[in-house]
Swiss-Prot record:
Disulfide bonds join C33-C66, C43-C56. A motif (Cx9C motif 2) lies at residues 56-66. The lineage of its organism: Eukaryota, Metazoa, Chordata, Craniata, Vertebrata. It comes from Pongo abelii. The gene is NDUFS5. Accessory subunit of the mitochondrial membrane respiratory chain NADH dehydrogenase (Complex I), that is believed not to be involved in catalysis. Complex I functions in the transfer of electrons from NADH to the respiratory chain. The immediate electron acceptor for the enzyme is believed to be ubiquinone. InterPro entries: NADH_UbQ_OxRdtase_FeS-su5. Residues 78-106 are annotated as: Disordered. This is NADH dehydrogenase [ubiquinone] iron-sulfur protein 5. GO terms for cellular component: mitochondrial inner membrane; mitochondrial intermembrane space; mitochondrion; respiratory chain complex I.
Length: 106
């Protein structure tokens, strides 16, 4: 925290929107994970770091999953492997537009 907050004194909001997604955004468009971050901040506000780690773990985990999409990517990879396996066995034929043989678009 700076000793003299010039942005606040002059009413400027130059980079504050970068630090917290829940902050007011320049074009009034909420970020992808705004709701999850807001829930986590509301849960953790005022109870301290140690208690917040325990009591707000669900909200924090939801927020981190929204940011990093690790579970989603893992699931997508599993689905893709299963699809490739079925194609190799001959049990599944992808549609022509998925393999690049569809009609060209205008």
């Amino acid at each position: 925290m700076p000793f003299l907050d010039i942005q606040k004194r002059f009413g400027l909001n130059i980079d504050r929107w970068l630090t917290t997604q829940s902050a007011e955004q320049p074009y009034k468009m909420a970020s992808r994970c705004h709701a999850f971050e807001k829930e986590w901040i509301e849960c953790a506000h005022g109870i301290g770091y140690t208690r917040a780690e325990k009591e707000c773990k669900i909200e924090y985990d939801d927020f981190i999953e929204c940011l990093l999409r690790q579970k989603t990517m893992r699931r997508t990879g599993t689905i893709r492997k299963q699809r490739d396996k079925l194609i190799k066995e001959g049990k599944y034929t992808p549609p022509p537009h998925h393999i690049g043989k569809g009609e060209p678009r205008p």
